[in-house]
UniProtKB/Swiss-Prot annotation:
Enzyme class, UniProt record, top EC level: hydrolase
UniProt-recorded Gene Ontology molecular function terms: alkylbase DNA N-glycosylase activity; DNA binding
Official protein name in the record: Putative 3-methyladenine DNA glycosylase
Swiss-Prot/TrEMBL GO biological process terms: base-excision repair
EC code: 3.2.2.-
NCBIfam families noted in UniProt: 3mg
Chain coiled-coil ranges: none
Length: 194
């Protein structure tokens, strides 16, 4: 199979976040195949990153982040929206990349919104049942897509992490600049080109 190998994920979250842009996120369940091209990510680089769930240490919720790379970390926000992350870096690092938005490619009705982590999870059928699943399986995997040139990538602060002090301003959010599928973010004047 032409899946991204586990070794792809076993690198720093910022590297993986950049290289996931353009990759295909594939979910094949119940006889249905749903595919989205990743157009927006956020890197969470470990325990020292105060915006990262791992900053609070090893808990039942974050245990998956401290495990091997190449595993899904899916959690709920506001008790109703799922967020899909890929665990990155070395075992014990507590790092992950949040997939914030995808462009519909296959298996999604026209007009399906996939801008934002909750919407993309709903569209692709990703739930807590996918938490801790390996990303190199027929059910859930990522494939190489069309590479996104550096000139087409924007970087800026992550969304919704104002509580993280100076970490809130780090440009760890990456997106395909001209994509119509990225989530809402800072106004254009605050966005930093690559």
């Amino acid at each position: 199979m032409n899946w991204l190998p586990e070794s792809f994920y076993a690198r720093p979250a910022l590297v993986v976040a950049r290289e996931l842009l353009g990759a295909l996120l594939v979910v094949e369940e119940g006889g249905q195949r749903r595919v989205g091209r990743i157009v927006e990510t956020e890197a969470y680089i470990g325990e020292h990153d105060l915006a990262c769930h791992a900053a609070k240490g090893l808990t039942p919720r974050t245990e998956v982040m401290f495990g091997p790379a190449g595993v899904a970390y899916v959690y709920l926000i506001y008790g109703m929206h799922h967020c899909f992350n890929v665990v990155t870096d070395a075992t014990g690092a507590g790092a992950a990349v949040l997939v914030r938005a995808v462009e519909p490619v296959e298996g999604l009705p026209p007009g399906t919104r996939t801008d934002g982590p909750g919407r993309l999870c709903k569209a692709l059928g990703l739930t807590r049942a996918h938490n801790r699943r390996g990303l190199c399986t027929p059910v859930l995997h990522l494939r190489p897509g069309t590479p996104v040139p550096e000139s087409a990538v924007s970087r800026g602060p992550r969304i919704g992490v104002d509580y993280a002090g100076t970490w809130a301003a780090e440009p760890f959010r990456l997106w395909v600049r001209d994509s119509q599928h990225v989530s809402k973010g800072p106004p254009p004047g605050r966005r930093k080109p690559a």
